[in-house]
Amino acid sequence: MRLLDLVAQSTNAAPTLPQGWALPGAHHFADAVRTCPLRLVLADDLIQCTNLLAYAEGERLSGCLDLIHVPSEQVWLEWLEATRQSALRAIPHCASTPCSSVRRHTGVLIAADLAGRTGTMRTFWSAHNEQAYCAALLTDFDLDHVIRPALDIEAALGGAAVGVAMPEEAALDELLSHVRFRLDAAWADYYRAADLDASQQLLLLREVLGTTAFDMPMILALFLLFAAKDGLQHQVVDLERLNHARRCSGKHALLDHIEVRAPITARYEYPRSVANTAARRRGPRLHHVRGHIARRGDKVFWRLPHLRGNARLGVVRSRTVQLSFR
């Protein structure tokens, strides 16, 4: 079952910890997901595409922030976590990115301002037991201003906002400067009362930030494609017959949603072939060529990442995708 339905149908009580601490659960946000006007489910090709675009070099995604906006004041996004992790591992400098082996699907519920430039994002995930879980961390973003605060571990566990910096990876660091993270108030109260020592605080903060911090670049890349002409392919899922059968059997109806694909890269490569490789001159050693973004006014040119140096990988017709915003 999709994560959006697991959250919408969630009725489990919030997790209760020793000493009576009641913490937010997925069921607290069931109504918000059910009433969300825009629910998007990302196809595998789009998950791969947005991750590649997010970490492209050149002017980088951060040079296109003025073109990005959240398309609705309330948005639900959902993706298959295994596909996202596979896409990150395929990017050489992201191979060591923290990944969760527990999550099956990951989703975010975004509340944005009318312009779609600032907002807050809450993360959810499902495990293989078909249970929905709510993250302890909230993500605030502002695409017009740098909002990254200094790192203060003790203050962060008390509910203050915290930033994530990656100076060794400029493409990601620029995006993260527009993002800050903070614990849900109930979780902050719980951790503050736990009286953790410095090493425990550091370990905990790494755990809660480890996977969530790397969602935002992919999401921003998605919204860039969303704003571009013909950047995405939308398919409204028709659940009328299925839901009729579910109601007749006493089950909850599934939520309408839109499946989103990325057709923009399909025409840029020929199928892989080993034909005529003997006639080709010997090329350089096989190596990875990183994606590259160049912007010319309202047009963005994205040079796709690719492998170079081995003809057996196929004949490439073009590796440049043009995104137009007018």
Regions found by a protein language model. Give the residues of each.
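Intrinsically disordered, low-complexity regulatory segments
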Residues: 1-271
